[in-house]
């Protein structure tokens, strides 16, 4: 079940999740407004996704902390690794960073604290953890998400290579990103190089609305 944090009445203050919109999304919003109008379904579809609404500042009775409390607990004598969640025996969610190119309104990642980005050493340790018993006995797939992992493609190479070396039990690596729909220019040779000679790597585009599937996004 979803984890719901009940706040004392005095603490029912809204979370400040700042508006963050890429220049490319700003241009797209302007184009849709000029072409269809500010209150049109075409413009609102994108604006509701990224433009901060004043109602977000109103107090609320409860807040959803996460979809599920699935963070991995480590023994007291071990140093815990950030960004690991496990929902099922055969799969694991890895969040190498909580940074994104743009902030989707009402994203539950806003409630994840503290914010972090894994170091190269931590990425290698994550791969070793996934490749060691008893975790490796059932783990066959990982989902790399965030945040958005493609905000740092140069760092992901370290994580992918670590899995190849230390976690051969992981047969599928899924990479979830909104970068193609938020800032398609970032899908350059540095990003594409991640997929070279990695047949077990799958890319998944996270989107809910057709307005984000622009020609540039589809090309990316």
Summary of predicted features, one role per range:
Residues 114, 149-150:
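Short strand->helix junction
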Residues 124-139, 150-220:
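Conserved AdoMet/S-adenosylmethionine-binding subsite of the radical SAM
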Residues 80-83, 93-95, 128-129:
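Catalytic micro-motifs at enzyme active sites that drive phosphoryl/nucleotidyl and oxygen chemistry
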Residues 10-11, 145-149:
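Conserved short loop/turn motifs at secondary-structure junctions
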Residues 1-86:
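Flexible, acidic/Gly-rich N-terminal and inter-domain linker regions that tether
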Residues 95, 143-145:
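Short glycine-rich or small-residue beta-strand-to-loop segments that form or flank ligand, phosphate
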